[in-house]
């Protein structure tokens, strides 16, 4: 599954070939936040269940990123330490936050697909 899945909190998830899942925020979310000036990344090798794992600070607000599914964090995007603006410049690629190994891959597939996410945005419009 290389296509993106989405949460109602405007996070995107992409299942990678190695079974890990990459997480970032959607263009809709980064646009609402404005210019991101700081990203606090999660701890590696930490198993997380439904908890805050990252914090974003922007010129408009601070926002938490919660672990979208249960799993172990295996990688963080260290480039965001020096260049948090990557979240705004390229939220679907270079602006990713972390990767994790999910406890249950089926939970990834059960998240919103692109059409369902588009409907969510339209409803929040």
Predicted feature descriptions by range:
Residues 1-17:
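Extended boundary segments
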Residues 7, 24-26, 113:
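Residue-level signal for threonine
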Residues 12-89, 93-94, 98-106:
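Compact, glycine-rich, soluble single-domain proteins
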Residues 19, 106-125:
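Ser/Thr/Pro-rich, acidic low-complexity intrinsically disordered regulatory segments
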């Amino acid at each position: 599954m290389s296509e993106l899945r989405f949460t109602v909190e405007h996070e995107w998830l992409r299942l990678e070939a190695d079974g890990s899942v990459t997480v970032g925020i959607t263009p809709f979310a980064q646009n609402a936040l404005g210019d991101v000036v700081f990203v606090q990344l999660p701890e590696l090798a930490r198993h997380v269940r439904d908890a805050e794992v990252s914090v974003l600070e922007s010129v408009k607000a601070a926002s938490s990123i919660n672990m979208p599914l249960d799993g172990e964090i295996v990688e963080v995007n260290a480039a965001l330490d020096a260049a948090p603006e990557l979240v705004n410049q390229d939220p679907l690629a270079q602006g990713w936050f972390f990767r994790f190994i999910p406890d249950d891959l089926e939970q990834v597939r059960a998240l919103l697909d692109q059409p369902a996410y588009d409907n969510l945005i339209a409803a929040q419009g």
